[in-house]
Amino acid sequence: EHCLNPSCMAACPSGAIYKRAEDGIVLVDQDRCRGWRQCITGCPYKKVYFNHKTGKAEKCTFCYPRLEAGIPTVCAETCVGRMRYIGIFLYDADRVTEAASVPDEKDLYEAQLSLMLDPHDPRVIEQARANGIPDAWVTAAQNSPVYKLAKEWKVALPLHPEYRTMPMVWYVPPLSPIVDLLKDQGHDAESSQNLFGAIEALRIPVEYLAELFTAGDTEVVTFVLKRLAAMRAYMRDITLGGEGNEEIANSVGMTGAQMYEMYRLMAIAKYNERYVIPRAHMEDAHNLEEMGCSLSVDGGPGMYGDAFNDMEGRPTPVSTSVYENSNKVSLFSWDGNSRPDGLFPNTTGKK
């Protein structure tokens, strides 16, 4: 989850888990890890696992070498449903402990949102520049799809905020069970009034989602589902050749333009709209993690040495320059047997 307040980092006796200052990614230092396994029990999301071959703890690295090159993570790149988005937040790191310490668990969601700074605010931009954040990162924050979904439109929610780890992977709750139920009962499943009534009447799905995303606060989940239902009804009128009903948008505190923008991002967004990833700046190259992909170490899930004998098990440097000089290959069109240029590192010095 790459939390703002990671419990695995606090639980590690060796101090092997750290949060990168440049992008907030939580990583495990394999040299310092001594296999205490306290991070495994300390992570409430069970995102840390123990590699019995190496005797080290491992976790999702968020494909940081790819991010440094401005390329999405592998899980996002290969998602057939195009359900994943990647963007950045500008947040107030000094207030993380304060936000995670609010007494009422139901206030944790709003407390976490309060940490997210408005990238369009001139004061935030000025302070970001003073702190050495490149303008390209500020621009990326302004165009971040995750910021729009989580903070601007408030339709994405954090997973189990009651753990007080301030997770930074956000989820849009599903509307489909309610739509399917209305359709099975013979009702108009696209009508905003029918959807609003069903959301309030079906307490079990709402309460279940509230336990997942809002520490049991059903009002927040109801608000999110109503916004999604309103977008569905608003766009149906436009699709059928009519004009968007502004009353539907206004009923959930949005405008027609915002409703259409949200629809576009969630339904037909292009590649560069779903993944807004600023590249690492070369002037900060000394801070980059110039090493092999963490999934391709001995004993790792990539099993680098066993999979590619001609590589002799040597880690391949994954950096901005490597991606710049390589060709893009579509995994969907790859036959799985050939070795097209750009898919594997060039170890012979020849194309």
Regions found by a protein language model. Name each.
Residues Y49, R66, V102-K106:
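A short linear boundary/processing microfeature
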Residues N5-R32, R37-G55, E68-R95, V146:
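Iron-sulfur cluster-binding cysteine motifs and their immediate structural context
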Residues K350-K351:
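Short acidic DE-rich linear segments
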Residues G81-T347:
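Long, compositionally biased charged/polar accessory segments in the mid-to-C-terminal portions
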Residues E1-H2, P65:
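The substrate-binding groove and active-site-proximal loops of carbohydrate-active enzymes
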Residues E58-T61:
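Membrane-embedded catalytic interface detector for glycan/lipid assembly enzymes
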